[in-house]
Structures are given as structure tokens and as C-alpha cells.
């Protein structure tokens, strides 16, 4: 019984290769998985694109850096030419839609409305005033912090005094109002016969005589 089930399953799997629809079911999704519910959108699988290629295509469209193929002369006379789908134009529209979605997503995340595409003079003035107000507020906050630090430093300095500035309890200021003192009188008479005095008298006489001879 088990062999019959295995043979039946293998037969169904081999016969499924003859039909494109059933074979396409086993194709891998965009996330490179065989069974992936996120790979489906609207009953169709997402195409397996390279993110780098998508970013480059968006950049080329925004910068208008496109290499449009030249129209062939043979297709110019084709009556069905207008009904054919231009792949370049189709891809361009696809990437333009992706760019618009990215812009809307960016505006939604940044909180900007869709009406703010064009910056008017009044909006610019409001923005400038707001920036100036913010700068003034920050400067005032910094100034208040500096003042608070200065007050705190002043309080700390007032708690301490210099050791050299302490008052000396034994210090006595100098006296400036002296009382006049009477000169001391010597009651003893001078000794004119003193040897020292006689010596000085002789030296003075010799000096005066020498000065006159010169």
C-alpha cells in the first residue's frame, strides 16, 4: 500500500511538469523561498528585483539621465505601433510611482503635510523666528546656569578666609603720639685736661697749618 502511494505521488509530480500553471506554483518567491505567504500580492508573486538596481533606476529618473532607444524605421510604418506597450515608458512610470510613494512615506514620517511642497515667504519667516526664539531660549538657559554657578562659588568663598588674614590677638598698634621729653642736662663739667681732648686739638692745629702752606 505504501509503495502505491509513493508511486502515485511521483506520477502526479512528473505529470505536473507538463502544465505551466501547476509548475509555476512551485517556483520560488521574491524572498527566495518555496512557500512564502509574503511573496504574494493580489494573487501574483512579487518580482525578484535587486534593490541596488532599483535605487540606481530611481536616481536616473530623478536626474533625467535616461538612455531612450532610437525608434527603428521599420516599426515607424507599423499600424500597430501605437497599440504596442513601450517597455521603457512602462518601467519609467513604475519607478516614478515608487519615487512618489517614497516621498509620501518620507513626508508622513517627518510630519510634513502634502501642502508644504512650496515654501512661501510667510512660512520661511515663521521658521526663522522659531529658530531665533529657540536660540535665545538656549542662551538664556546657559546664562542662568552661569549665574547660578557664580552665586554658588561666592557662597563657598565666603565660608573660608585666608589664614594670613586672621586677627592676631596679641597685636598692638604702634604709638604715634609721643610726648616731648626734656633734654638731659649733664651736671659734670668738661675735663679740659683730658688726653683724648688734647690729642684732637693738636690734630686740628696740624691740619690747619698744612692747609695754609698749600
Swiss-Prot record:
Ranges where the record places region Disordered: 64-83, 106-138, 166-197
Bilayer topology: Lipid-anchor
Coiled-coil residue windows: 120-162
Signal peptide coordinates: 1-17
Compartmental location: Cell membrane
PROSITE patterns: PROKAR_LIPOPROTEIN
The keyword Flavoprotein appears for this protein: no
Lipidation feature positions (N-palmitoyl cysteine): 18
Compositional bias segments (type: Acidic residues): 64-77
A GO CC term assigned to this protein in UniProt: plasma membrane
Lipid attachment residues per UniProt (S-diacylglycerol cysteine): 18
Assigned keywords, A-Z: Cell membrane, Coiled coil, Lipoprotein, Membrane, Palmitate, Signal
Name of the featured protein: Uncharacterized lipoprotein RBE_0877
Organism: Rickettsia bellii (strain RML369-C)
Amino acid at each position: 500500500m505504501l509503495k502505491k502511494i509513493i508511486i502515485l505521488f511521483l506520477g502526479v509530480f512528473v505529470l505536473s511538469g507538463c502544465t505551466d500553471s501547476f509548475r509555476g506554483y512551485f517556483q520560488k518567491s521574491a524572498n527566495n523561498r518555496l512557500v512564502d505567504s509574503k511573496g504574494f500580492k493580489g494573487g501574483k508573486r512579487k518580482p525578484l528585483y535587486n534593490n541596488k538596481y532599483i535605487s540606481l533606476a530611481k536616481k536616473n529618473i530623478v536626474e533625467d539621465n535616461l538612455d531612450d532607444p532610437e525608434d527603428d524605421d521599420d516599426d515607424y510604418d507599423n499600424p500597430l505601433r501605437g497599440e504596442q506597450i513601450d517597455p521603457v515608458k512602462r518601467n519609467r512610470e513604475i519607478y516614478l510611482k515608487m519615487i512618489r510613494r517614497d516621498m509620501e512615506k518620507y513626508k508622513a514620517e517627518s510630519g510634513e503635510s502634502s501642502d508644504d511642497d512650496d515654501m512661501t515667504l510667510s512660512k520661511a519667516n515663521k521658521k526663522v523666528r522659531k529658530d531665533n526664539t529657540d536660540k535665545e531660549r538656549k542662551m538664556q538657559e546657559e546664562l542662568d546656569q552661569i549665574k547660578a554657578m557664580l552665586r554658588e562659588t561666592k557662597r563657598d568663598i565666603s565660608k573660608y578666609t585666608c589664614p594670613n588674614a586672621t586677627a592676631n590677638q596679641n597685636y598692638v598698634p604702634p604709638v604715634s603720639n609721643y610726648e616731648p621729653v626734656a633734654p638731659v642736662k649733664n651736671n659734670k663739667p668738661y675735663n679740659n685736661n683730658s688726653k683724648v681732648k688734647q690729642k684732637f686739638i693738636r690734630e686740628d692745629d696740624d691740619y690747619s697749618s698744612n692747609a695754609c702752606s698749600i
